Amino acid sequence: MEASFVQTTMALGLSSKKASSRNVAVERKNLITVCRFSVKTLLEKYTAEPIDDSSEEFVNFAAILEQILSHRFKACAPAGPVSWFSSDGQRGFWDYIRLACSKVPNNCVSSIENMENISTARAKGRAWIRVALMEKRMSEYITTALRDTRTTRRFYDSGAIMLRDEATILTGMLIGLSAIDFSFCLKGEVLDGKTPVVIDYTPYLKFTQSYDYLTDEEERHSAESSTSEDNSPEHPYLPLVTDEDSWYSKWHKMEQKFRIVYAQKGYLEELVRLRESQLKDLEAENRRLQLQLEEAAAQNQREKRELEGVILELQEQLTGLIPSDHAPLAQGSKELTTPLVNQWPSLGTLNGAEGASNSKLYRRHSFMSTEPLSAEASLSSDSQRLGEGTRDEEPWGPIGKDPTPSMLGLCGSLASIPSCKSLASFKSNECLVSDSPEGSPALSPS
């Protein structure tokens, strides 16, 4: 028995949930439909003249739009649940608009926040509706707000118009209002936030439907039977005007529709031109940035090649400056980048017998400047010690050390050169040494 009671309760809860969702769907559909009728009425009557607060059609449209923005809004009440049409909530749709529309360029949110005569959230929301219509940017505001899905879900319950596909339909309808000039005064009792909004459905319940739009045969037969029984000229399906008035009214309606479509066409063409100009500017900026990128890449490659060449040149110079450890002295002297010229000690002073035979060791060398010569002037004393070490036919050079190229600086002296400064007066970069048996000048202590 308890199980059956639980099942019954669950079935009732499920049915009530379905009924609630069905009611919400009906509310959504009704609000979108009446909003479409209201926008159509505004476009038909006020395309050629501005609209202000005295227009009943606008007052009704503002009430409908406020109801749509407040549909399933999470309003916080002091106690008890708040319905979607209640005016007892602590906050209104303005709190959502203030956050979701803050990213719109040149928006009116800050100006409405700074209004002194408007304090409540409802009054600010109504002021925003009027300012957005005067700016002809209502559709842009709503579209930007819908893109912020996180904020929208935070302010609206499931089933709200702002969370459904009907919101896209709403933005499409609001585009047509850009063809109307609105003029409002943001002062008065309509913006105090205390007066609840009421939608007047009576203008949209009066309609005339012709037989051409009837699709159900039974409905057509019932209409014919009711016409024959009542035989009353006030039947809604019978024409109440003459043919001339009918044609004139049709022509007037067609003219109004043409003006509306023409105004919307001009607005859309202007919008397309604006977007095309923006697209051209962006394409030009893109090309400019591409050229800058290509130039930067080419310059980078050139600098890279130059640096690689410098690295290779420095490696070659470093390889030439660092000889092998056990190479002969002559081979090491050949590897010098700046050879020593006329800096060898006199062979006669070292060994008289070997001086004449080895005097041909002098070669012709070239030097670039006098700096390498002057840099080794301080090594003359070491050269004298080398000369003393070669007496009695002993090999010249320090005993116990290898004659490696690192000791080349100890093999010569600048004492035989009259002056290092006189080298700058040489007309040629090459020095020719004769093969005469005369030895070099004796070493002079430094």
Swiss-Prot record:
MF-aspect GO terms: GTPase regulator activity
Residues with Phosphoserine modification: 232, 416, 419
Bias-annotated ranges (Polar residues): 372-384
GO BP annotation list: positive regulation of cGMP-mediated signaling; small GTPase-mediated signal transduction
Xref: InterPro entries: Run_dom (IPR004012), Run_dom_sf (IPR037213), RUN_RUNDC3A (IPR047338), RUNDC3A_B (IPR047340)
Region (Disordered): 216-239, 372-404
Keyword Phosphoprotein: yes
Subunit structure: Interacts with the GTP-bound form of RAP2A.
Name of the protein described by the UniProt record: RUN domain-containing protein 3A
Organism: Homo sapiens (Human)
Lineage: Eukaryota, Metazoa, Chordata, Craniata, Vertebrata
Protein's gene: RUNDC3A
